[in-house]
Amino acid sequence: MKQVTGFAPASVGNVACGFDVLGFALTEPGDEVTVSFTDDENSPAQVIISKIIGDGGALPTDPYKNTASIVVIKFLEFLKTHKGIEQSGTFSIELKKNLPLSSGMGSSASSAAAALIAANSLLGSPCTKMELVPFVMEGERIACGSIHADNAAPAMLGNFILTRSYDPLDLIPISTPPELYCSLVHPHIEVPTSHARSILKKEIALSSAVRQWGNVGALVAGLLRCDYELIGRALEDVVAEPVRAPLIPGFYDVKHAALDAGALGGSIAGSGPSIFAFSDSLAKAETIAKAMQETFRKVSNLESDIWFCPVSREGSRIL
């Protein structure tokens, strides 16, 4: 039997103004997936889930309904069809969930990316990380009913990733400014991604679209120029944040607390309920995270978990 353990970090999709087209990875926390392979030339390849730790029994063990396993199934099918690599035997998956569910932290993408990087390594790395991203996106379909790359791509690749197009898929990595840090607070409530997506408007005013486009362009420019002040100005969302904010008790109070503590800017992480904020030093990031946590406690009587760390430049990796 051979086995490999993969890790993939939490990620933040949308990044305020970049709904479904922009995301970044954190250095922590992240999910761990161990993939074990037992060869059996008399048996066709099968994928099973042997153990899930840390989910409180919430995740399915059916390999076709769990993001960590379905992506490995799709990956093996791809290898057989497109690369002439066919396996026989059993791939057993053990998932250690370190990310909260329905948190806006890219939990499903983290599990999928960790499983894929482990399975790919186990088979001699026949695919590049970039080639693995579409499989992570298939995991997102299982998790929330739609394919999107704003968590899937950074969880696998690290850094900021801009999705220029979905058909064909065109991913553009953006290097992270050296002194950019993220504070993340996760209140102890759940906001299912499917619900957070369902309440969004299907059409928006042209004036809102123009403002959003301007902010996306400015954010990308700020990242490329390492212009921290511009990054902060660009963290404005006129499309999703106003609709989703009511799902998070005390959201605007927490956001203002982050700004008062020195944040460059911030918004809802993905579909929520987590909230992120950027700063230009680790010390500030810690202060901001604690301020957001305390505000949730005072304003909404909600306990929360916090993290403060750099943006991950690596994404998924083998442990």
Swiss-Prot record:
Gene3D superfamilies: 3.30.230.10, GHMP kinase, C-terminal domain (3.30.70.890). GO terms for cellular component: cytoplasm. ATP binds at residues 100-110. One of its GO terms (molecular function) is homoserine kinase activity. It holds the Pfam family GHMP_kinases_N. Keywords: Amino-acid biosynthesis, ATP-binding, Cytoplasm, Kinase, Nucleotide-binding, Threonine biosynthesis, Transferase. It is an enzyme of class 2 (transferase). It comes from the Bacteria. SUPFAM superfamilies: GHMP Kinase, C-terminal domain, Ribosomal protein S5 domain 2-like. GO terms for biological process: threonine biosynthetic process. Pathway: Amino-acid biosynthesis; L-threonine biosynthesis; L-threonine from L-aspartate: step 4/5. InterPro entries: GHMP_kinase_C_dom (IPR013750), GHMP_kinase_C_sf (IPR036554), GHMP_kinase_N_dom (IPR006204), GHMP_knse_ATP-bd_CS (IPR006203), Homoserine_kinase (IPR000870), Ribosomal_Su5_D2-typ_SF (IPR020568), Ribsml_uS5_D2-typ_fold_subgr (IPR014721). Its main location: cytoplasm. Its EC number is 2.7.1.39. It is found in: Cytoplasm. It catalyses: L-homoserine + ATP = O-phospho-L-homoserine + ADP + H(+). Belongs to the GHMP kinase family. Homoserine kinase subfamily. Catalyzes the ATP-dependent phosphorylation of L-homoserine to L-homoserine phosphate. PANTHER family: HOMOSERINE KINASE (PTHR20861:SF1), HOMOSERINE/4-DIPHOSPHOCYTIDYL-2-C-METHYL-D-ERYTHRITOL KINASE (PTHR20861). This is Homoserine kinase. The lineage of its organism: Bacteria, Pseudomonadati, Chlorobiota, Chlorobiia, Chlorobiales.
